[in-house]
Amino acid sequence: MLSLVQKIIGSRNERFIKKVSRIVQKINSLEPEFEKLSDEQLKAKTFEYRERLANGEILDNLLPEAFATVREAGKRTKNMRHYDVQLIGGIVLHQGKVAEMRTGEGKTLVATLPAYLNALTCDGVHVITVNDYLAKRDAELMSDIYEFLGMSVGVIVADLNPQQRKEAYACDITYGTNNEFGFDYLRDNMAYEKEQQVQRSRNYAIIDEVDSILIDEARTPLIISGASDDSSEMYNLFNRLVPYLEKQEKEEVENEQEQRDFYVDEKSKNAYLTEKGYAKIENMLKKEGILEEDDNLYSPHNITKMHYLNACLRAHSLYQLNIDYIVRDREIVIIDESTGRAMPGRRWSDGLHQAIEAKEGVKINAENQTMASITFQNFFKLYNKIAGMTGTADTEAFELHSIYGLEVIIIPTNKPMIRKDHHDEIYGSVREKFDAIVEDIKERISKGQPVLVGTASIEASEVLSTLLKKKKIRHNVLNAKQHEKEASIIAMAGYPDNVTIATNMAGRGTDIILGGNLEVEIAQLEDPTPEDIAQIKAEWLKRNEAVKKAGGLCIIGSERHDSRRIDNQLRGRAARQGDPGESKFYLSMDDNLLRIFASQSMAERVKKGLKGGESLAFGFMSKVISKAQGKVESYHFDIRKNLLEYDNVVNTQRKVIYEQRQSFLEAEDVSDILADIRIDVAEQLFHDYVPAGSMHELWDLEGLEKALKSDFMIELDLQKLYEEDDSLGEEDLKRLVREAIEIEFVEKTKNLDSGAVRQFEKFSLLQSLDTHWREHLSSIDHLRNSINLRGYAQKDPKNEYKKEAFELFSTMLDNFKYEVISSLAKIRIVTEEETQRAQQEWQESMSDIKAEHESVIDNNQRHDEDEQEEAPKVQQVRREGPKVKRNDPCPCGSGKKYKQCHSKVE
């Protein structure tokens, strides 16, 4: 019935394309008129549109003329004319949607349309790509169009200084990577002067490869951190002990004889000790002198040892060299599981990175303390409008809409797509699969067809390379180890009988042109004559035709990825712009996808039915594979959704802190802010010792006097005042405390330079807020890592997390207010020059910070399945002894006051 309705009225996508096609017709009708304009008249259009906007016209009304302007500028500056389907793509992007456009359809050119239109508001447009190379390339390619129309273009890359960044952000259109935009946002919220901030408003963002950025990288927060204590000795110790532990093949075993020391969950990438394993590691630690004879790992004071142990256990049992990471220049470099690219600068969290450094014998870098962090999910929600482009988004349409509110529109291709997708072939073993791939390659190159082989890991690419060498088949390998050669290898990939092996989507963002890349060949010539160029073009045309006759580029996948989208990205490298092409995937029942997610009975039946070298290529196996991929995609979606639910709690708090901080930063005079804080602190302090509405017998006036003296340098004999006049009530005493704090500050500052006082007050506010926010993030991390244990007490961990995170936040704000007033009361306010010097020293102490895109495997995600299991009831712990007041010594024995120690985390 549904298909019948769709045939009559069309799908939503078809109806949308039909609707915007009317706008395209209007743009096309303007083309003859704009062709008649002189260059100066065309350039003047930008000023005209901005005037019309200032007079109340809206962008949607300007769209046809603005797009016609950009199209004409493209023809005059780049000899490139936007096709109708590219105009549709531009409209989709302007409307804040995701445009799915096939490889080779000109997404870079499409972005110029909405970028120009939205830059007319003078609020800035950010065009976001996945790496520095693409950001610089796209900005350079399109800058002629923008600059012709009077628009300035900037590029944000990793090696820019703050002034260069500020200038780039001031441009009408700014290109850059998702990481750089995110880190600049965090750094701006750590600045101590307004002039140090580089970004302006986050108005409109166009995200290239939107699926990669908003989905693949959604679990990896951007983190700015500073080094914490060195723990390399403990990592080295556990790295030495873990190899003595034996792996148990599955979680449940039938008898004790089969029990080993630990088992792994490959889906969640976690490892768990058995009771036997706990006993074994405890004995080893006692022999090493790390544990006392009567001690055990379950003790609360050994929680850090468990942290090191779990990290090293996962490093040895779940993370493999040349699959999950490589060692480059004596450093561990993560391999992105979706793209196969090396990700320098990215680090795993939870001590995993340090554990792998210990495993590989390289320098162990200290774990870091988080100073600021944000996920891409919440960073991009800061923009007024976002849009995205990619070749593969339809399979992730539900997630893009449910989390980001982005609708996916599939844009028709300019020319019909004629790629031939063959059935998958499934073999019994990995070796048989690779042998079949080699034979297929051999057959295809014999007729001059170029082949691109996509592998899921560096290890697989090197195994395949070894087999091809044995057969004396020339080939290029493109993986994280050869990343420097990426552009040149991809440029050659379309040559006749050329074989290229690439891990996943290495080289994504660069078109593979049949016959080779003509522009690259011409660029490599030194002082070419017109005759040289003509000869190169003639040779290229011959190669291009030869490759087309051979069937175009053939894509061979050495295994299916966890996500259908990644498979589609690989397929999408072939048959660009109406060219011929083919794709085929080879699988084995030992591949991770089928081994982990397909049913065991199915795998056994398939293996039994296949004799050596035989394969299956039936339709029902496609259903099995699709079902397995669906399981993985659903699992990863749940993880990302779960991450967002937890991060939203911190995000709400982050917004409050950053808005408050910005108000401090922008204020010329913070004395009114401090006056309000002093009132809050006076009330807070008073009620710590005089409970609201309580009888006199419960008042602790002596304690209040001591707190005023120790924390605010105020001598106030409240007990004597009350004895002299017992009519003094609670409100009278509170007023006396409030006035005493206010008078003390006025007296302290009355003879000082007001400029120095104001500057010092602002600096103190910012410094104190930053310190407390940083400590709060650490407390939140600890809470997050332990909150799943609440499930064993029959409590919902998420609700408990929200409740306790709010309590932590409220306590942090109270402590911030209290300590900033206390510190201002104690510190001698000095000259303006000394204040500036103190500020500079503080900023220098903050200079040893790192901006990292951390690969997080969240403990909350690992225990998602555990949360569903019935947990045993546990007895609630009740406080023994009297309540500890905020100004009492902390019972932990640290020597600090309770308010400055464990009050923050209780």
Curated annotation (Swiss-Prot):
Subunit-structure text: Monomer and homodimer. Part of the essential Sec protein translocation apparatus which comprises SecA, SecYEG and auxiliary proteins SecDF-YajC and YidC.
An example Gene Ontology CC term for this record: cell envelope Sec protein transport complex
Gene3D superfamilies: Helical scaffold and wing domains of SecA (1.10.3060.10), P-loop containing nucleotide triphosphate hydrolases (3.40.50.300), SecA, preprotein cross-linking domain (3.90.1440.10)
SMART domains for the chain: SecA_DEAD, SecA_PP_bind
Enzyme Commission numbers on file: 7.4.2.8
Source organism (scientific name): Francisella tularensis subsp. mediasiatica (strain FSC147)
Protein name as annotated: Protein translocase subunit SecA
Purpose: Part of the Sec protein translocase complex. Interacts with the SecYEG preprotein conducting channel. Has a central role in coupling the hydrolysis of ATP to the transfer of proteins into and across the cell membrane, serving both as a receptor for the preprotein-SecB complex and as an ATP-driven molecular motor driving the stepwise translocation of polypeptide chains across the membrane.
Bias (Basic and acidic residues) ranges: 853-865, 877-888
